[in-house]
Amino acid sequence: HYTLPVSNKNIVEIVKRAFNMVDKRLIGHGSRVSYIVFQMLKAADKYSSREVRDLLILAALHDIGAYKTDEIDRMVEFETNHVWNHSIYGYMFFKYFTPFEKSAPVILFHHTPWEKLKGIDKIAGPLKLSAQLINLADRFDIYLEQAKEYRCYQTFSRYIEGCCPDRYCPEAVALFNKADFFFSVQGDIRRIGRDFTE
């Protein structure tokens, strides 16, 4: 039996650092999305430590399929259209090259609106919720990046409630609203982004 000389955490860190080199706009994005998902999972108070760990790894590396600048241009827009390529490549990475084969659909569908995702019978409910948590955290991080200009951080919660139940599943929205991070999210998320790039 052969074991790697580094821990899972070190492998994730190595992959994240390499991924951050793809495009400067992605630096720290996965870490911030993972942090936001973590706050939602804490609010749910029903996940095992293994489930939390696995979902945080998926969240940190959710855009690992992105490597083309034109698609990254679309990914960093608030409204996501035509961003399937990176989701497909990320799905293939997780399905064929990691121990996350069963969770790979989370990456494939992390930009899929709830109205479409809920009708896909081949995907288990927990995987759909995980995809929605990453989707919501991803959009929130992009929103915070853009909101620097508009100074309207609190309007995101109203936005997602207005989109629900078409864009986001009600359970994900409820966890987002229950999560305890609004008071410090701006400072904490920016700090987290810096921590992974220094």
Listing of model-derived features with the role each one plays in the protein:
Residues 1-198:
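Histidine- and acidic-residue-rich, metal-dependent catalytic cores
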